[in-house]
Amino acid sequence: MATPAAVNPPEMASDIPGSVTLPVAPMAATGQVRMAGAMPARGGKRRSGMDFDDEDGEGPSKFSRENHSEIERRRRNKMTQYITELSDMVPTCSALARKPDKLTILRMAVSHMKSMRGTGNKSTDGAYKPSFLTEQELKHLILEAADGFLFVVAAETGRVIYVSDSVTPVLNQPQSEWFGSTLYEQVHPDDVEKLREQLCTSENSMTGRILDLKTGTVKKEGQQSSMRMCMGSRRSFICRMRCGNAPLDHLPLNRITTMRKRFRNGLGPVKEGEAQYAVVHCTGYIKAWPPAGMTIPEEDADVGQGSKYCLVAIGRLQVTSSPVCMDMNGMSVPTEFLSRHNSDGIITFVDPRCISVIGYQPQDLLGKDILEFCHPEDQSHLRESFQQVVKLKGQVLSVMYRFRTKNREWMLIRTSSFTFQNPYSDEIEYIICTNTNVKQLQQQQAELEVHQRDGLSSYDLSQVPVPNLPAGVHEAGKSVEKADAIFSQERDPRFAEMFAGISASEKKMMSSASAAGTQQIYSQGSPFPSGHSGKAFSSSVVHVPGVNDIQSSSSTGQNMSQISRQLNQSQVAWTGSRPPFPGQQIPSQSSKTQSSPFGIGTSHTYPADPSSYSPLSSPATSSPSGNAYSSLANRTPGFAESGQSSGQFQGRPSEVWSQWQSQHHGQQSGEQHSHQQPGQTEVFQDMLPMPGDPTQGTGNYNIEDFADLGMFPPFSE
């Protein structure tokens, strides 16, 4: 009973809140075992309480560790994100095939910033500029070298902030026309949208999209598009800018080439009242406006209209076509033009120079077959040439045909054509033709030759210095070769006026040489012994022997005239060495054995063999108008052959002298020789001396004297 009583009171007490502690008090003594058994539970609760205390003590440190790891993770993610953006912004990093590491990205970014800001130089205050140049001079030199003009426009509005004065020679516009206007007004209407896209710094739907050539798909450029807002982002585009009508008188002379280049790269002829445009290549950077540390006046604030960015660029003429032809070297009339055809001969492009060559406008020829302008008799020939050039695949083929011009006349045209092939598909894209007016080209070449002859006609022979050549065997050989070139019959006609300028006294002196055509210098009964032996020529000076027929005169000119007559009669081949031609005034000489210039102790005389001379009896030799020495080929061979087996230099100097002499016989044949006065300058001072030259009085020695010298190879006429 005790047991249920002990059990029920707690159950009953549980229903009464106020009697919870009443049954516990009397059971305090009797429930020793139960209390003892309940102690572990109480102790367990305390341990759980102690465990709570331990967890509460470790909680803040664990939470702090978890927070620190989270912070580090977020920081690493942000750093990776920023470095990825930096890698996309640096062109050198984005161009790499594989993704670089973080250190490489940072290093390339620093190098890129230095190159953009110019901090690679130690001095950033402009001290790198040469000290001898001012800023204005440096600016003009840069623009002159670039052959363009500098301009600054607001990025948002396109308002022109600055333009250099070099815009005048490039676009033929005064600087004042650009100030107060916008760049949109200066470009072609079809290029306005393209220019607006280049000046825009914000992203649009087409910004940052690139075409993948491998797959043919359009991809997003990623973070590269953020460079449009980046300071110093580069701009490069081509547009058509309007040309002005500034007078050429205000342009410097050194800009003629630029003007010709601008007309060449123009977009063809324009109609009346339409503006002319030129293709301009603009390169520059987007910069902040106004620059850091610079304040602009209030009146200039309206120009920028609160724009934060501006475009600083240089505009240069873009050469659309630069054909290599003669008329590009000067301001002459064009003689050729370019044309492009398809494989069927249809004209797809024509050079504007066709207006000056054939008279047609480019639009009159576009879309038409070239056979329509060809002569009916030449159409088959031209058609075959086009078919042949397609088969040649890149080789040049030329053809000449008659072309119908604008004024219904036939013009002889030479067309040099070749094909352009696609390097990938190896298919013929089009045919390029260079069409040249043959007649006009020949006229220009003839005019060029006339100008050259005019320049040569003013050449004064008296101003030519004559060097003192040493008289020797080696120099004599050189003089013979030079004489062949000077006195040849095939002389250039451009020098006719130079030879026609010989004074009248020289003509008179040479005229008397044709009067004695049948005389004989050396008669068959001459007392001279037979040919001289072939001993070595010991002296470089040769003296003319005292022949009875040659009398010493009181002047050098008289001796020259007599020797000329003897040459016309006997065809003596003057060879060998002779003293140098002093080119000075020589006083009258009396009958001496040796003249003063020949400083040799004893005079040497070399008698000639009478059989060595073959006088001509043909009347052609005495006729002034006939061919000099017409029977020269029928003469007996071998001059001075008594001591040699073969005759060297068989009369060649004689022919040379006769050719030069025959030019003056027909003009002054009736005049008599006038004696020169003592002290007068010697004739032919301007000509180089020749071996065996009769003007030197040394033509009566034989070729035997050079028998032992091997520097004169034998040759036949």
UniProtKB/Swiss-Prot annotation:
Localisation: Nucleus
GO cellular component terms given for this protein: aryl hydrocarbon receptor complex; chromatin; cytoplasm; nucleoplasm; nucleus; transcription regulator complex
Region feature Disordered, mapped onto this chain: 1-20, 35-74, 548-717
Listed Gene3D superfamilies: Helix-loop-helix DNA-binding domain, PAS domain
SMART domains in alphabetical order: HLH, PAC, PAS
Stretches assigned to the PAC domain: 398-441
Modified residues (Omega-N-methylarginine): 42
Nucleus in keyword set: yes
UniProt domain bHLH: residue ranges: 63-116
Compositional bias segments (type: Basic and acidic residues): 63-73
UniProt biased composition (Polar residues): 549-574, 585-605, 642-651
Compositional bias segments (type: Low complexity): 610-625, 658-680
An individual GO BP term: response to hypoxia
Primary subcellular site in the record, as a coarse category: nucleus
GO molecular function: aryl hydrocarbon receptor binding; DNA-binding transcription activator activity, RNA polymerase II-specific; DNA-binding transcription factor activity; DNA-binding transcription factor activity, RNA polymerase II-specific; protein heterodimerization activity; protein-containing complex binding; RNA polymerase II cis-regulatory region sequence-specific DNA binding; sequence-specific double-stranded DNA binding
NCBIfam families on file: sensory_box (TIGR00229)
Subunit structure: Efficient DNA binding requires dimerization with another bHLH protein. Heterodimer with NPAS4. Heterodimer with SIM1. Heterodimer with the aryl hydrocarbon receptor (AHR) or the SIM1 protein. Interacts with TACC3.
Function: Transcription factor that plays a role in the development of the hypothalamo-pituitary axis, postnatal brain growth, and visual and renal function. Specifically recognizes the xenobiotic response element (XRE).
Disease: Webb-Dattani syndrome: A disorder characterized by postnatal microcephaly with fronto-temporal lobe hypoplasia, multiple pituitary hormone deficiency, global developmental delay, seizures, severe visual impairment and abnormalities of the kidneys and urinary tract.
Protein name, entry field: Aryl hydrocarbon receptor nuclear translocator 2
Lineage start: Eukaryota, Metazoa, Chordata, Craniata, Vertebrata
